[in-house]
């Protein structure tokens, strides 16, 4: 029998997910920023073609030289602020949607319904959360892509400045640039992220007493696979985010479809996966989120 939702349980999920997300995101912030720069540099007004980063190592070497060591954490505060409600809402809604998708389903006799139910609950949770926090995700991307060294060279002076300038130049819609492809990508990512993880754990002899190392190993595989599958969607959405604040003559992509086509034609299919290896490394943080979530939830009783 599926338990009924209760306010305390929802709040506990929210808190456990948020705490684990904030800790893991701060730990992998340098990798996150390198990945972001490799993804969007071709669409950046600040990075000339001959100054583009050649790869992950080049990016790691040049960032502290050109922007200072603290630049590795540029946009991290915005990322934590964004990630806390995003991840917390994902986990909290995941359990709510589970009741809708998995009510009365026996995992032992109805495996495929159980698997598809987990996919559905994970995807729905991610899409729902995205509606609430997308402007923060947009701001985090633009702050992370800002390569100016001092205040005078920076495009934005912080989270609020980024939001204000974007709304002033593009209106509220400017904060939701790339939203459609983001929803597509988040559903694919979250479906794999939650669906496969919960299904794999559910198939273990004693899921509630699973070793933390086994949980981490399962989570590592899940986050890596789901991250690679959804990576092209992430690249396109971030490229679209880079269009806000530009004059019409400077806009590179007319819409999402145009972005897909131009990246493929002008840069090749490999461009959709720029920074993907750093995303695999970053996936360690995602795996830690899943494991920490279970541990924190257990501590909260």
From Swiss-Prot:
Locate the transmembrane regions by residue number. Answer: 10-39, 77-101, 112-132, 181-201, 213-233, 276-293
Q: In the record, what terms sit under GO molecular function? A: ATP:ADP antiporter activity
Name where it's found: Mitochondrion inner membrane
Q: State the signal peptide span.
A: none
Task: Give the start-end ranges of region Important for transport activity.
Answer: 237-242
Inhibition and activation profile: The matrix-open state (m-state) is inhibited by the membrane-permeable bongkrekic acid (BKA). The cytoplasmic-open state (c-state) is inhibited by the membrane-impermeable toxic inhibitor carboxyatractyloside (CATR).
Which keywords, in A-to-Z order, does the entry hold? Antiport, Membrane, Mitochondrion, Mitochondrion inner membrane, Repeat, Transmembrane, Transmembrane helix, Transport
Q: How does it sit in the membrane?
A: Multi-pass membrane protein
Q: What is its main location?
A: mitochondrion
- Record-listed ADP binding positions: 82, 94, 237
Physiological role: ADP:ATP antiporter that mediates import of ADP into the mitochondrial matrix for ATP synthesis, and export of ATP out to fuel the cell. Cycles between the cytoplasmic-open state (c-state) and the matrix-open state (m-state): operates by the alternating access mechanism with a single substrate-binding site intermittently exposed to either the cytosolic (c-state) or matrix (m-state) side of the inner mitochondrial membrane.
The free-text domain remark for this protein reads: The transmembrane helices are not perpendicular to the plane of the membrane, but cross the membrane at an angle. Odd-numbered transmembrane helices exhibit a sharp kink, due to the presence of a conserved proline residue.
Q: How does it assemble?
A: Monomer.
PANTHER family, per database record: ADP,ATP CARRIER PROTEIN 1-RELATED-RELATED, ADP_ATP TRANSLOCASE 4
Q: What name is this protein filed under?
A: ADP,ATP carrier protein 1
Recorded source organism is Anopheles gambiae (African malaria mosquito)
Source species taxonomy:
Eukaryota, Metazoa, Ecdysozoa, Arthropoda, Hexapoda
